[in-house]
Design a protein with these regions (language model features):
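Residue-level signature of catalytic and energy-coupling elements of molecular machines
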Residues: 41, 59, 131, 157, ...
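A short, conserved beta-strand element in the Rossmann-like catalytic core
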Residues: 4, 33, 61
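DNA-recognition element of transcription regulators
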Residues: 151
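Catalytic donor-sugar/metal-binding loop of nucleotide-sugar-dependent glycosyltransferases
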Residues: 118, 142-145, 154-172
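A conserved acidic beta->alpha catalytic loop
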Residues: 2-11
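Acidic-histidine catalytic/liganding microenvironments
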Residues: 16-20, 76
Length: 175
């Protein structure tokens, strides 16, 4: 999803789409926010009959090598939604700046209170996967469309009694 980018993102997506029919470009103009971009992608996954939708930002903070680890719990029926967690593994936390770790700790605590997912950590991590079955039950247009999207999505997942699993992935910045 190209959410109103002013760089060459749209052109790059279109180029990939010409070479690979599995790439389906979605463009927002103007920028509508991270939540709106994710919602557009989710709606397209449902419309195209996908079984699982994954979110991996284009800023190189999410290593594609960890995508199978996010998909497996859903494929195996152990989760409806999986999300990356940079905090579970001490070695993975080393790449996270101290100020970001502090802020993440506060947001994690507040999200646990709001969502009811007490075992969950690192709610700001956007490397996620969700079953399309779960998406079909969620009121996608009612979920906050801005930067707090992931936090609000967790609240909605709990309202709909969905199983959420954290998956250990390394923090990756500045690459």
């Amino acid at each position: 999803v190209n959410d109103g980018s002013s760089d060459r993102t749209g052109e790059i997506i279109e180029d990939y789409a010409r070479r690979d029919p599995r790439v389906v470009p979605i463009h927002h103009s103007p920028n509508r926010g991270v939540g709106a971009a994710i919602t557009s992608g989710y709606k397209r996954a449902v419309a195209d009959g996908m079984e699982i939708a994954a979110v991996m930002a284009g800023d190189n903070q999410m290593d594609p090598a960890y995508l199978p680890a996010l998909l497996d719990p859903i494929v195996e029926g152990r989760a409806d939604y999986t999300k990356g967690n940079r905090l579970i593994n001490e070695a993975y936390r080393k790449g996270m700046p101290a100020w970001r770790s502090f802020g993440n700790s506060i947001l994690t605590f507040l999200t646990k209170i709001a969502s009811g997912y007490w075992q969950m950590m690192d709610p700001q991590n956007g490397y996620t996967a969700i079953s399309v079955k779960a998406l079909a039950e969620l009121p996608l247009d009612s979920i906050y469309q801005g930067y707090g999207y992931y936090n609000n999505l967790l609240v909605w997942l709990n309202i709909h009694n969905m199983t959420v699993r954290d998956v250990a992935i390394p923090a990756r910045y500045g690459r």
